[in-house]
């Protein structure tokens, strides 16, 4: 996606992955973390939104498992579709295809919008495995072989108007977001991509930190 915005285009990319997401009201993992990324040219930094469509990724569960800690509530369910904070149990069930998995972004039910994370996961599936007629998340790892699919798109803003004016209009709105009234105790409102831009600049200036 960033390759597109570097050329003044709106970029989109997504991928499916081995099934870890339990659809809303299901108890079997059927979708991957299925991340989606959008990038849009803007000043002073490009808008860069990149997220999984699950509450967390598999790596977060693996980290909690290594530390021997219970995961926060609302991350996963066991093979019966019951909430679980046991990372080892959930990871084992996913690996053995015994049921359970990680919840969609928004959680287990429709109350806090779990169906929306599920739907966004389906959008990633559509633009990766369905349009390419490849392996869907529940079938992309067969016999130890990967058949993961990807989707990419670049949109030329010239189709809609003057690219410079569109960029200026979007940049102005992003600045208005940054300057919106802040919640109590907060001193800054970020737009997507700012933290990453600042992190990259810091690493270039100071080097990559190494933990002992």
Regions from the PLM with identified roles:
Residues 12-15, 39-41, 49-52, 154, ...:
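Short beta-strand segments
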Residues 69-139:
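Secondary-shell segments that build the walls of catalytic and ion/ligand-binding clefts
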Residues 1-31:
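Long, hydrophobic, well-ordered secondary-structure blocks that form the structural core
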Residues 21-95:
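Phosphate/diphosphate-binding glycine-rich loops and adjacent basic-rich segments that engage nucleotide
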Residues 126, 131, 139-212:
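Catalytic-core signal marking the mid-to-C-terminal active-site face
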Residues 6-10, 16, 43, 54, ...:
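Generic secondary-structure signature for well-ordered alpha-helical cores
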Residues 33, 100, 115-122, 164-172:
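Conserved active-site and cofactor/substrate-binding residues in soluble primary-metabolism enzymes
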């Amino acid at each position: 996606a960033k390759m597109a915005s570097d050329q003044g285009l709106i970029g989109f990319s997504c991928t499916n992955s081995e099934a870890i997401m339990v659809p809303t009201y299901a108890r079997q993992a059927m979708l991957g973390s299925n991340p989606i990324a959008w990038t849009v040219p803007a000043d002073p930094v490009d808008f860069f939104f990149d997220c999984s469509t699950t509450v967390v990724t598999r790596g977060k569960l693996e980290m909690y498992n290594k530390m021997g800690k219970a995961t926060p509530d609302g991350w996963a369910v066991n093979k019966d579709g019951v909430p679980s904070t046991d990372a080892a149990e959930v990871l084992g069930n996913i690996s053995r295809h015994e049921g359970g998995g990680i919840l969609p972004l928004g959680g287990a039910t429709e109350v806090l919008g779990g169906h929306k994370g599920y739907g966004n996961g389906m959008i990633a599936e559509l633009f990766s495995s369905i349009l390419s007629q490849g392996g869907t998340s529940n079938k992309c790892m067969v016999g130890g072989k990967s058949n993961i699919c990807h989707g990419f798109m670049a949109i030329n803003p010239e189709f809609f108007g003057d690219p410079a004016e569109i960029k200026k209009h979007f940049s102005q709105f992003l600045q208005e977001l940054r300057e919106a009234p802040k919640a109590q105790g907060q001193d800054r409102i970020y737009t997507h991509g700012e933290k990453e831009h600042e992190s990259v600049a810091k690493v270039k200036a100071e080097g990559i930190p190494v933990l002992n």
